[in-house]
UniProtKB/Swiss-Prot annotation:
Entry-linked CDD domains: Radical_SAM
Organism: Flavobacterium johnsoniae (strain ATCC 17061 / DSM 2064 / JCM 8514 / BCRC 14874 / CCUG 350202 / NBRC 14942 / NCIMB 11054 / UW101) (Cytophaga johnsonae)
Binding positions (S-adenosyl-L-methionine): G165, E166, S197, S220, L221, H222, N296
Protein name as it appears in the record: Probable dual-specificity RNA methyltransferase RlmN
Domain Radical SAM core: 100-334
Organism superkingdom: Bacteria
Length: 349
C-alpha cells in the first residue's frame, strides 16, 4: 500500500533541520529548503536549484508541496475581490480582498465548511470537510497580497480570520500560518494588524492568552442573552455567556488587549431594549469596542436587517458608557463576498 506523503510545508524550520540530521545530512539544508518553500514560493523540489539533486530526490520520496489555485476571481462594484480557491484535493474555499481608502484587508478561511451552526451564516450550511493546512491559509494571504499590489499599488495591510470556518477549531494550523505571515520569510507583518474572529470557545480563548499571542481578538457575539444567542448560534448552548465572560476577563488580564465584539442587529430577534441593556452590561466586563455589522441576506429571508432606529439605540446606549462603536457597512454583497455570505458557490462548477 502506498503511504500518503506529508505536505512538507506543515513542518517548522526546526522540524526540517531535524529531518536532514536524521537522514545524515547537514542541518542547514533545512534552512535552505525552508527559504525555498516560503520566501521563494517553490512549487516543486526541482525549483530548488541550490539544493543537491540527491537531496531533492530524497525530498520527493518523502514529501509533497501542496499549493492552492485561484479558480475564479470576482470583482465587486466597490472594488472588493472574492477568490474561489481550489485546494490540492479538489475542495474549494473562499477568501476576500477588502479595500478602503487607507488600507487593504484579507479575509481568509481556516476550514473547508465550518464546524459550527450559526443560523445566519451561509458557510454553516456546509458541513466541515476538513481543516486547512498552514500552507493553504498562508497561500490565500499571499494571493490576496498580490491582488492588493496589482489593483491598489501597495502590499496587504491587514488580515482578518473571518472567512469560512471557526479558526479556534483549527488552532495549531492557524497559529503556524500567522507565524509565517509575521516572519521575515513571509510578509513581515505586525501581529497587531491581524485579527482572529471566533464564535467564542472559552477554553481556546484562555489557551490563546496562555500562549501569549500578539494578534487581536474579535468575538462574534450577536446577543448577550443566552437564550437569544442560542437561537442565533445553536452551538452556544454548550458555551454559556458566563463562561465566555470568564474567558475574556482572563484574556484581558493576561494580554491587556481589548476585545472587539462583532454584532448584527436583526429585526424581531435582538432589536429590543432588553438586548441593548444586556450588551451594555456585557461590555462593562472587559475593555472593548463594538462593531455593529450590516446584515447580508443568504437567500431565505429568515433573518432580516433591523431598522436604523434600532441600530441607533445600540449606538447611543454604548456610547453613553464610553464604548467605541463602529457601524460596518458590508462590502462585496453583489458577489456574495460580504460577512456571512461565503458558501462555496464555485465548488460545484
Amino acid at each position: 500500500m502506498q503511504i500518503e506523503k506529508k505536505d512538507i510545508r506543515a513542518l517548522s524550520k526546526d522540524q526540517l533541520r531535524d529531518f536532514f540530521v536524521a537522514n545524515n545530512d547537514k542541518a542547514f539544508r533545512g534552512n535552505q529548503v525552508y527559504e525555498w518553500l516560503w520566501s521563494k514560493g517553490a512549487h516543486s523540489f526541482e525549483d530548488m536549484t541550490n539544493v543537491a539533486k540527491t537531496t531533492r530526490s530524497m525530498l520527493e520520496e518523502n514529501f509533497v508541496i501542496n499549493h492552492i489555485k485561484v479558480d475564479t476571481m470576482q470583482r465587486s462594484n466597490d472594488g472588493t475581490v472574492k477568490n474561489a480557491v481550489r485546494l490540492h484535493d479538489g475542495l474549494v474555499v473562499e477568501s476576500v480582498l477588502i479595500p478602503t481608502e487607507t488600507r487593504t484587508t484579507a479575509c481568509v478561511s481556516s476550514q473547508v465548511g465550518c464546524s459550527l451552526d450559526c443560523n445566519f451564516c451561509a458557510t454553516a450550511r456546509l458541513k466541515r470537510m476538513r481543516n486547512l493546512e498552514p500552507g493553504e491559509i498562508y497561500d490565500q494571504i499571499m494571493a490576496i497580497d498580490k491582488e492588493s499590489r496589482l489593483y491598489h499599488n501597495h502590499p496587504l495591510s491587514n488580515i482578518v480570520f473571518m472567512g469560512m470556518g471557526e479558526p479556534l477549531m483549527n488552532y495549531n494550523n492557524v497559529i503556524k500560518a500567522i507565524d509565517m505571515v509575521t516572519s521575515e520569510e513571509g510578509l513581515g507583518m505586525s501581529p497587531k494588524r491581524i485579527t482572529l474572529s471566533t464564535s467564542g470557545i472559552p477554553k481556546m480563548i484562555k489557551k490563546m492568552a496562555d500562549d501569549d499571542v500578539k494578534f487581536r481578538l474579535a468575538v462574534s457575539l450577536h446577543s448577550a442573552i443566552d437564550e437569544t444567542r442560542a437561537k442565533i448560534m445553536p452551538f452556544s448552548k454548550n458555551f454559556p455567556l458566563k463562561d465566555l465572560r470568564e474567558a475574556l476577563e482572563y484574556w484581558y488580564r493576561k494580554t491587556k488587549s481589548k476585545v472587539s465584539y462583532e454584532y448584527v442587529v436583526w429585526k424581531g430577534i435582538n432589536d429590543d431594549k432588553a438586548s441593548v441593556d444586556a450588551l451594555v452590561k456585557f461590555c462593562k466586563y472587559v475593555p472593548c469596542k463594538v462593531n455593529l455589522i450590516e446584515y447580508n441576506p443568504i437567500d431565505d429571508g429568515e433573518f432580516q436587517q433591523a431598522s436604523e432606529e434600532s441600530i441607533l439605540a445600540y449606538i447611543k446606549a454604548l456610547e453613553n458608557i464610553g464604548v467605541v462603536v463602529k457601524v460596518r457597512r458590508s462590502r462585496g454583497k453583489d458577489i456574495d463576498a460580504a460577512c456571512g455570505q461565503l458558501a462555496n458557490k464555485e465548488a460545484e462548477v
